[in-house]
């Protein structure tokens, strides 16, 4: 249990710092739909596609690795709560089209990126 908690904590710390750095680096470019949040979610979608495929192909790895990467790092990197707050702000400002666009780009984009991550691993496993 202790190793699981440590793995999740280490991964979550690295993921949260990565998300914060993406926000610092990109959110000033286009504050209406902060690109740091979008990049974190799209990158997280891609990486979870890779991770799920990798761990499915390597079931003998200790479970702490999956906890570190998926529950910890990707849980800290991706940010549904920030996305929700940003969309709510757009709705409160009456920017319905922007809110709808943000929802579409985050949700559809993350799903597409997850599929691309899985496809990447499929291609790598063939070679």
Curated annotation (Swiss-Prot):
It is a multi-pass membrane protein. Pfam families: CRCB (PF02537). It comes from the Bacteria. InterPro entries: FluC. Na(+) is not transported, but it plays an essential structural role and its presence is essential for fluoride channel function. One of its GO terms (cellular component) is plasma membrane. One of its GO terms (molecular function) is fluoride channel activity. The keyword Membrane applies. It catalyses: fluoride(in) = fluoride(out). Keywords: Cell inner membrane, Cell membrane, Ion channel, Ion transport, Membrane, Metal-binding, Sodium, Transmembrane, Transmembrane helix, Transport. The keyword Coiled coil does not apply. Na(+) binds at residues 75, 78. Its main location: membrane. The chain crosses the membrane at residues 6-26, 37-57, 67-87, 96-116. It is found in: Cell inner membrane. One of its GO terms (biological process) is cellular detoxification of fluoride. Fluoride-specific ion channel. Important for reducing fluoride concentration in the cell, thus reducing its toxicity. Belongs to the fluoride channel Fluc/FEX (TC 1.A.43) family. This is Fluoride-specific ion channel FluC. It comes from Tolumonas auensis (strain DSM 9187 / NBRC 110442 / TA 4).
């Amino acid at each position: 249990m202790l190793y699981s908690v440590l793995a999740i904590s280490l991964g979550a710390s690295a993921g949260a710092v990565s998300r914060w750095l993406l926000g610092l680096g990109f959110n000033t470019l286009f504050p209406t739909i902060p690109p740091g949040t979008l990049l974190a979610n799209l990158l997280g979608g891609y990486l979870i596609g890779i991770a799920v495929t990798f761990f499915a192909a390597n079931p003998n790895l200790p479970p702490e690795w999956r906890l570190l990467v998926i529950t910890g790092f990707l849980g800290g990197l991706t940010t549904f709560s920030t996305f929700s707050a940003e969309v709510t702000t757009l709705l409160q400002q009456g920017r319905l089209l922007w809110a709808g666009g943000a929802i579409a780009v985050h949700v559809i984009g993350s799903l597409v990126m997850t599929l691309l991550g899985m496809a990447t691993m499929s291609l790598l496993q063939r070679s």
